[in-house]
Structure formats: C-alpha cells, structure tokens
C-alpha cells in the first residue's frame, strides 16, 4: 500500500460534552489487494486517492476555520443556534374559581373598574364591579349578562376581532409558550454540526515529522475531556 495515500482518521462524537472524542484510522475501509497484480494495485490506489481528495474538499466547504483542531469550548458565534418549537400546555377551566375571582375584583390585565353609566356624560365614577356596559379597557370573568351582548362566553373564553362560536371546550383552554433561550448557546456542538465540522481527516505522512507535531487527537487513547493522553505525562 502506498504511504503517500493515507487512510483517513474517523472522528468519534462525545454527546455529553458536545465535543469530538478523538480520531482513529478506519482500517475497515482498506481493500484486500495482497494477491493483486500491479494493475489492480494501481486502480485501488486511484480509488483511495480520489476518496481522500473528496474528503479534503468537503472539509474545506463545511468546516469552520479555527486555530485548534478540536476546541474544548465553542464560542456562541460558531455554534448552530436552534429555535425550538413552541410548547402548548393544556389548562383546565375552573368556572367556580373564576366566579370567586370576579366577585373579589379580579380582572384581565389592563382592566379598569371605573364604568360609565348609561346616558351620563360626566366623568367616570366608581361603582360595582359588574355592569351591563363594557368600555373596552377590561372584561370581567364569568359575567353571564354581558356575554350575550359582547360575544363573550360565560366561562371566560373569548376571541379577538370577532365574536364567533368558539371551538374550545368550555372546561379547557390552551396556553402556548415560546421556548427560546435568553442568551445564545455556547460550549458544545450538536450532531448535525459535528458531522459538518469533523469530516474524516486526511493526514499526510503522519510519522515523518517530529513526535511533538503529531496531533494528540489522532492518538487512540486521547481523552477529549481532560485534553490529555492516558499513560503520558
């Protein structure tokens, strides 16, 4: 086998840390050509050389330029930021509790207990919580009287921009929560980014230089967490 056509180093993924756990040569990709003639050996070497060239081009396209081959901490600017889907929570309705809240003066956010009396042009005057007229800035929960006039249901379920029939179950309501982080994530990378960043490495003439120049990540017993090689000081 030609030494000028090395076997690529396959990276392994450390899911707990989101880092590459090291790399090792994939000897299973070698072809058995020990009994082949010069022509077959040349064809095998041609296939291997083409494979290495494809890997080099892929790494140049998808890998992020970085000074360290396997950084222990990826900055937020280089980490794929995922936008999780909203979370929908089912909230049970409690009409009795809502009646108690209304009788205690509870209102939806932005409401006001000052109501203009019918036919009066004087300034707002304080009055009971429940009235037949709603003046836009708040609604009361479980008001059976006003629900028929304004399209509000007595169980508190209402719609914006219309008063059509609601499809909600009277005893249920849904709350949608947006699951998003307040700060961009940093540290480890996900599986999709790992596949793009750590393309199988083609390392030419690995044993021709000084031992200190050989990447530690290519040593089989390299520990990505401690950034050391087991058995070496």
Curated annotation (Swiss-Prot):
It holds the Pfam family Adeno_PVIII. The modification Phosphothreonine is found at residue 64. Induction: Expressed in the late phase of the viral replicative cycle. Cleaved by the viral protease during virion maturation. May cause the middle segment to be shed from the capsid. The modification Phosphoserine is found at residue 180. Residues 112-163 form a propeptide. All late proteins expressed from the major late promoter are produced by alternative splicing and alternative polyadenylation of the same gene giving rise to non-overlapping ORFs. A leader sequence is present in the N-terminus of all these mRNAs and is recognized by the viral shutoff protein to provide expression although conventional translation via ribosome scanning from the cap has been shut off in the host cell. Interacts with the peripentonal hexons as well as the hexons in the facets. Part of a complex composed of the core-capsid bridging protein, the endosome lysis protein VI and the hexon-linking protein VIII; these interactions bridge the virus core to the capsid. Belongs to the adenoviridae hexon-linking protein family. This is Pre-hexon-linking protein VIII. It comes from Human adenovirus F serotype 41.
């Amino acid at each position: 086998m030609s030494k000028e056509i090395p076997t690529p180093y396959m990276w392994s993924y450390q899911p707990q840390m989101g880092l590459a756990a090291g790399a090792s040569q994939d000897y299973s990709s070698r072809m058995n050509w020990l009994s082949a003639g010069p022509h077959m050996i040349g064809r095998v070497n041609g296939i291997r050389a083409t494979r290495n060239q494809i890997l080099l081009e892929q790494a140049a396209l998808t890998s992020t330029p970085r000074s360290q081959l396997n950084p222990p901490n990826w900055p937020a600017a280089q980490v794929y930021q995922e936008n999780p889907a909203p979370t929908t929570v089912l909230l049970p309705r409690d009409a009795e509790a809502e009646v108690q809240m209304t009788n205690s003066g509870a209102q939806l956010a932005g409401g006001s207990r000052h109501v203009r009396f019918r036919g009066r042009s004087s300034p707002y005057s304080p009055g009971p919580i429940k009235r037949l007229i709603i003046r836009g800035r708040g609604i009361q929960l479980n008001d059976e009287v006003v629900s028929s006039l304004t399209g509000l249901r007595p169980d508190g379920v209402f719609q914006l921009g219309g008063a059509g029939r609601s499809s909600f179950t009277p005893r249920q309501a849904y709350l949608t929560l947006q699951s998003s982080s307040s700060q961009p994530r940093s540290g480890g990378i996900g599986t999709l980014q790992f596949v793009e960043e750590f393309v199988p490495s083609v390392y030419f003439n690995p044993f021709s230089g000084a031992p200190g120049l050989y990447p530690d990540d290519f040593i089989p017993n390299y520990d990505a967490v401690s950034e050391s090689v087991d058995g070496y000081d």
